[in-house]
Amino acid sequence: MLNKRVIPCLDVNNGRVVKGTSFVNLRDAGDPVELAARYYREGADELVFLDISATTEERKTMAEVVEKVSKEVFIPLCVGGGLRSIADMTTLLRAGADKVSVNSAAVSDPDLISRGAEKFGRQCIVVAIDAKREGNSWQVYTHSGKKPTGLDAVEWAMKAEQLGAGEILLTSIDADGKNTGYDNELNREVSSRLNIPVIASGGAGSPEDLYNALDKGQADAVLAASIFHYGRYSIAEVKKYLKSKGLPVRLEN
């Protein structure tokens, strides 16, 4: 069984890490390079950076952030937020990212997934899906959770895999930033249908929440932000807890 991964998520706006609730009410959480270095020391398995302003100007700033981080941190870096083209992907991969994450652009241009996988290898391409529960299913939203697409989240995840995605980053908009646990029904519905890893995101408030996403939700990895940014738990504490519950995780010596 592959190790379960614990991945801090850093939302970057104007070169600073921020955190909100259900994608709004942003507050400052620190310097991206300092936070990344701290998480690396604490035993993070990977880091995800999401550029939430994603203007052209900000893309340059983001590439600079990635370049600095890649000199301090020697674990995989995934970067996303507003990527619309192979050129955008190339900029970030050249700056030092190991993977790129596409969201809104993949919905409007699904072939971008295939083109990216063909050029860089599918292990590089992460498709981020922001899903909101509607009755017994989940709808995909784009543009930072503001725009409904009419797409079913489970079906879209399956299609993304067929198109060449190497991983799915699955965020519950309903749970995001509330620290009350992940939507594990959503996680399980998607994970059980795919042959590629699913990263569960949105709702982490405690080590138990991360365990439930990996166990009940059948996710391969868990993404969390505020529980780490504000020092509520360290990555080492979380991983020791997961290990004590019998999950395979990589512990620092």
Swiss-Prot record:
Its EC number is 4.3.2.10. The keyword NAD does not apply. SUPFAM superfamilies: Ribulose-phoshate binding barrel. It catalyses: 5-[(5-phospho-1-deoxy-D-ribulos-1-ylimino)methylamino]-1-(5-phospho-beta-D-ribosyl)imidazole-4-carboxamide + L-glutamine = D-erythro-1-(imidazol-4-yl)glycerol 3-phosphate + 5-amino-1-(5-phospho-beta-D-ribosyl)imidazole-4-carboxamide + L-glutamate + H(+). Pfam families: His_biosynth. GO terms for cellular component: cytoplasm. InterPro entries: Aldolase_TIM, His_biosynth, HisF, IGPS_HisA/HisF, RibuloseP-bd_barrel. Pathway: Amino-acid biosynthesis; L-histidine biosynthesis; L-histidine from 5-phospho-alpha-D-ribose 1-diphosphate: step 5/9. PANTHER family: IMIDAZOLE GLYCEROL PHOSPHATE SYNTHASE HISHF, IMIDAZOLE GLYCEROL PHOSPHATE SYNTHASE SUBUNIT HISF/H IGP SYNTHASE SUBUNIT HISF/H. HAMAP family: HisF. This is Imidazole glycerol phosphate synthase subunit HisF. It comes from Dehalococcoides mccartyi (strain ATCC BAA-2100 / JCM 16839 / KCTC 5957 / BAV1).
